[in-house]
């Protein structure tokens, strides 16, 4: 039996499903031999070329992402120990800037204190394409490094609109209980709704689909999310 045929027996890819149904389908369609991530694709009625509509926000998921987040904090003085005490995997300044210049980027997130940004900004060509450049909007440029580390480790996700007007984000793992995925998705949904720019006319959040890493996208009836 082909994968597409087995998927077709589980759901109709043209239909919209209530959130709980959609999650159930994603779980049934998952056949990978590892704990797949569960991903959301959210289509917004925005034009990211306009600064006001270029949405970039963060939120903490109540049940985490299920992923171990490897963090680098770029800081100086007592902020180095503060970050390490909070759980940062790596922390330093010039030594790590030099490592990044040499091509080392074996981390999931970088947090930086504001004083590190002038030097870090010079590495934009390395960090930018990988989505690793710290940004105040996402809470990764801050003096409160302990809080930032704790939030990232607990399951902070960045919600950033792409050129196509779509936000892609992880919302958990296939092994999560359905209720935990629902709570995470509602948190993402409500956070995005609150970020609606005043310039947007008509419906803001247009479409949503949910999938596992290796599975098909299932369309969600956004009216079923409250």
Predicted regions and their residues:
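Translation machinery proteins
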Residues: 19-81
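Flexible, glycine/charged-enriched surface loops at secondary-structure junctions
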Residues: 34-38, 195-207
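Structural signal for hydrophobic packing residues in well-ordered secondary-structure cores
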Residues: 11, 15, 23-34, 48, ...
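Long, charge-patterned amphipathic alpha-helical coiled-coil/hairpin "stalk" segments used as oligomerization
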Residues: 88-193
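Residue-level signature of catalytic and energy-coupling elements of molecular machines
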Residues: 22, 83, 128, 210
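Generic N-terminal amphipathic, Lys/Arg-enriched alpha-helix
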Residues: 1-12
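Short flexible coil/turn linkers enriched for glycine and charged/polar residues
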Residues: 65-67, 77, 162-165, 201-204, ...
């Amino acid at each position: 039996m082909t994968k597409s045929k087995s998927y077709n027996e589980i759901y109709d890819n043209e239909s919209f499903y209530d959130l709980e149904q959609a999650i159930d389908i994603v779980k049934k369609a998952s056949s990978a031999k590892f704990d797949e991530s569960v991903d959301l694709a959210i289509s917004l009625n925005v034009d990211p070329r306009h600064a006001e509509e270029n949405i970039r926000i963060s939120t903490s998921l109540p049940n985490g992402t299920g992923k171990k987040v490897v963090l680098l904090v770029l800081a100086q003085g007592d902020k180095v120990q503060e970050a390490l005490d909070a759980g940062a995997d790596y922390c330093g300044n010039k030594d790590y800037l030099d490592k990044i210049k040499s091509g080392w980027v074996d981390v999931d997130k970088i947090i930086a204190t504001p004083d590190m940004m002038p030097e870090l900004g010079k590495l934009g060509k390395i960090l930018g394409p990988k989505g690793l450049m710290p940004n105040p909007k996402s809470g990764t440029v801050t003096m409160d490094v302990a809080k930032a580390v704790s939030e990232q480790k607990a399951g902070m996700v960045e919600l950033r609109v792409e050129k196509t007007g779509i936000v892609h984000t992880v919302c958990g793992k296939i092994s999560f209980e359905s209720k935990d995925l629902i709570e995470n998705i509602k948190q993402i949904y409500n956070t995005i709704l609150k970020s609606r720019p005043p310039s947007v006319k008509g419906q803001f959040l247009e479409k949503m689909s949910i999938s596992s890493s290796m599975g098909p996208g299932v369309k969600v009836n956004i009216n079923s999310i409250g």
